[in-house]
């Protein structure tokens, strides 16, 4: 029932986005597009072809799931990606092994656990969530283990096949001690791998590509061909929705004659696990590697009045302060519903706002946001 309700809400959101575009004067065409030239695209839908022309072309066709070469996606063999999960067919499995302890893998671990499945995460590195601050990653690992989610680090899959009983046999190898283990499961979910989805006819543009088969662009999102731009997963880099939105605005500005180079400073991330993680700026490992003069400031939701009243008492905020400049280098949250708290950190890191200014903000009381001030005091 809850999934059905979520589907209804998402459909309303899509309708809202469509209405916003139409109010802005954007015409939407549904179908398969083919690039004819730098200034012409043809769209085929229901046997009819529509020719569209313009002075500029933006390639923003995203990416699709992929997998390591030795482990091809194959739904008939139980080796699946997020697309198969979101179709709904695999949500009722009793057991799942997830390859990758990245944001995608950890979010799906939370989903499957809430659906009642036994969950095992296999992570090639020595810890899950390598893009996060180490304190966040360790916190999430401990919370996962409390929930019964098994986390195996330094591990990868060497073999995967159905046995005679219809169970999927996954052979995982631990690179730390060179041992192997057989896991019996209903599905192997492969995460963190993707290939760019390229439109038909893109080769006609004779673009310059990088070594990962992504379109090369400059800081204005311009490709090697005049009037042709590219954004999002087709250019690689930071493959997140907020990065693609920023790149889209940069490309639009370039087309409109208001060129401003893209800046990823203050780019944040959110991991919708249980509990959640969010962050912006440098991790402590980054600050240490750069030999910066920094100080760690920390506060806990168990001491925040609003968090306690909501029952959100686990978790913390960790803030890295530049001792010399007295600005915020990074801000990292772990806890319940903390995805809504990261915006102040984004503003502080993006604009190099002094610590004193952030600390003295007259925030509403009682709110969870006050934990930022509590950490900086």
Q: What function would you assign to each model-found segment?
A:
Residues 272-377:
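Flexible, glycine-rich terminal cap/loop adjacent to redox cofactors
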Residues 65, 102-104, 135, 195, ...:
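Residue-level detector of alpha-helix initiation sites
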Residues 1-54, 132-155, 284-289, 374:
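N-terminal Rossmann-like dinucleotide/flavin-binding domain of flavoprotein oxidoreductases
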Residues 74-93, 182-255:
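FAD-site-proximal beta/loop scaffold in flavoenzymes
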Residues 8-14, 18, 86-87, 93-97, ...:
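Rossmann-like dinucleotide-binding cores of NAD(P)H-dependent redox enzymes
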Residues 30-32, 37, 61, 81-83, ...:
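Short loop/edge segments at beta-strand edges and connector loops
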Residues 47-56, 177-187, 224:
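Core beta-strand elements of the Rossmann-like FAD/NAD(P) dinucleotide-binding domain
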Residues 59, 99-100:
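Conserved N-terminal Rossmann-fold NAD(P)-binding element of oxidoreductases
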């Amino acid at each position: 029932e809850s999934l059905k309700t979520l589907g209804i809400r998402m459909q309303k959101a899509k309708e809202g986005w469509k209405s916003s575009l139409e109010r802005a004067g954007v015409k939407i065409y549904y179908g398969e597009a083919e690039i004819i030239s730098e200034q012409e695209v043809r769209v085929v839908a229901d046997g009819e072809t529509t020719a569209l022309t313009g002075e500029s072309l933006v390639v923003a066709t995203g990416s699709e799931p992929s997998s390591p070469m030795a482990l091809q996606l194959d739904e008939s063999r139980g080796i699946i990606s997020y697309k198969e999960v979101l179709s709904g067919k695999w949500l009722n499995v009793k057991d799942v092994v997830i390859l990758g302890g990245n944001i995608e893998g950890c979010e799906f671990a939370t989903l499957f656990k809430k659906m009642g499945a036994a969950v095992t995460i296999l992570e090639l590195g020595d810890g899950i969530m390598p893009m996060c601050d180490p304190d966040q990653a360790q916190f999430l690992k401990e919370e996962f283990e409390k929930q019964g989610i098994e986390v195996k680090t330094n591990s990868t899959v060497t073999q995967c096949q159905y046995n005679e009983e219809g169970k999927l046999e996954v052979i995982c190898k631990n690179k730390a001690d060179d041992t192997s283990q057989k896991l019996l499961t209903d599905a192997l979910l492969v995460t963190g791998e993707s290939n760019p989805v390229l439109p038909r006819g893109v080769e006609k543009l004779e673009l310059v590509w990088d070594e990962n088969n992504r379109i090369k662009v400059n800081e204005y999102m311009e490709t090697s061909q005049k009037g042709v731009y590219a954004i999002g997963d087709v250019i690689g880099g930071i493959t997140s929705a907020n990065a693609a939105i920023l790149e889209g605005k940069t490309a639009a500005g370039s087309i409109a004659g208001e060129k401003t180079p893209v800046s990823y400073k203050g780019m944040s991330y959110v991991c919708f696990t249980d509990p959640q993680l969010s962050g912006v700026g440098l991790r402590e490992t980054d600050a240490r590697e750069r030999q910066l003069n920094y100080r760690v400031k920390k506060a806990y939701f168990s001491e925040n009045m609003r968090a306690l009243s909501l029952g959100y008492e686990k978790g913390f905020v960790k803030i890295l302060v530049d001792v010399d400049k007295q600005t915020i280098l990074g801000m990292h949250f772990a806890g319940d519903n903390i995805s809504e708290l990261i915006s102040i950190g984004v503003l502080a890191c993006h604009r190099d706002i002094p610590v004193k200014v952030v600390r003295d903000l007259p925030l509403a009381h009682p709110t969870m946001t006050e934990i930022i001030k509590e950490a900086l005091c």
